[in-house]
Structure formats: structure tokens, C-alpha cells
Amino acid sequence: MGREVILKSRVPKGYRHPELDGSLRVTRTKNEARLIQEARRLGVPTPVIYDIDTTDATLVMQEIKGPRVKDLLDASGPEQRAKVCEEVGRLVGLLHKGGIAHGDLTTSNMIWSEDRVWFIDFSLGSKKAELEELGVDLHLLREAFQSAHSHIMESFDIIIGSYRNSFPKAAEVLRKVKEIEDRGRYT
């Protein structure tokens, strides 16, 4: 092929009925490929999908080389962190504006390469996402920040500011985030 690729395979789960397992793995593989391609169409950097093997539930996609945003944020100074966080907020806004919820929005599922942020692993994502799913995305990202980046929580405010600037319905989603957080406190 001449290109460096990643193979992402969904392995069979022995505890599931084989027919159900095969169907679920293929459906989830196709869904992830669609979301990656749709996100790219919206202007969010994602890996190029080269092939979808529905027999083995495998994606063949572009390898994105670079540090995870999780690692980059910890190793960067304030100026670089601000640049990265502003881009993260803008890209999340683009995804949400296009109706896509990532489903596992953490700094571990973002890679810094070619001076930009790439989003990976849309396996838990959804298209035509409801307000709740968009809120869960931001809630997960905030939790990831509190867990992995508690010493730079002010950087999360940059993400939210950029998100507000790139997504007209940001205020609604942020209200939903507050509601989700409040539910978590009382359960």
C-alpha cells in the first residue's frame, strides 16, 4: 500500500450468541466509519478510512502520528496549552453543530499532529445526537480534565469559550451539562 495504517478490529465476544455478536460488531464498525467520515466532512481532522472489512469487523485507517492531547497538555507551556484548548473547543463545536456526539470525548482520544488536533475513536459516538448526548460529551471532557489535568483546569475554560464561539446552541448544551452534573451529585 505504501501508507502507514492502523487496523482497528472488533474481536468476537464469547459470551454473546455468535450471530448477534457478528451483527453487532459489523454494525458498530460501519457506524464508527460513518461518523469518522462525517466528522471529517464537517472540518474536524480525523483519520482517513481506507477500507472497511465487514467480514472481520475491521477498519483500515490512516495512522496519525503524534502525542495524545492528554500528554501534550501536561508537557506544554501556557501559550501552547491555550492554542490546543482553543482548537479542541472549536472542533467539538463543529462536531456538535453537525449533530455528532463523540461518545468518549477525552483528551486521550485526541492526537496533536501537523500543528492541529485530530479526533479518534468514535466507537461510542452517534449521529443526530440529542441534547443529552452533547451534554454528556462535554461532561466527559470536564471529568477527564478534572482527573488528568486538575492542575490546569483554567485551560478547560478556554475550551468552553471556544466551544461557545463555534456552536450557536452552546448555552443549551452547557445547561444540560449542569443538569447532568447535578443528577450525579444526588444519586
Name every feature range the model reports, one short phrase each:
Residues 1-30:
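ATP-binding glycine-rich loop module of kinase domains
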Residues 54, 65, 107, 124, ...:
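Short, glycine/acidic-enriched loop or turn micro-motifs at the edges of active sites
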Residues 2, 74, 79, 87, ...:
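Regulatory N- and C-terminal appendages and interdomain linkers associated
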Residues 118-187:
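C-lobe/activation-segment region of protein kinase-like
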Residues 37-44, 70-108, 113, 138, ...:
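Conserved kinase catalytic-core helix
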Residues 15, 25-29, 40, 44-88:
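Conserved structural core of kinase catalytic domains
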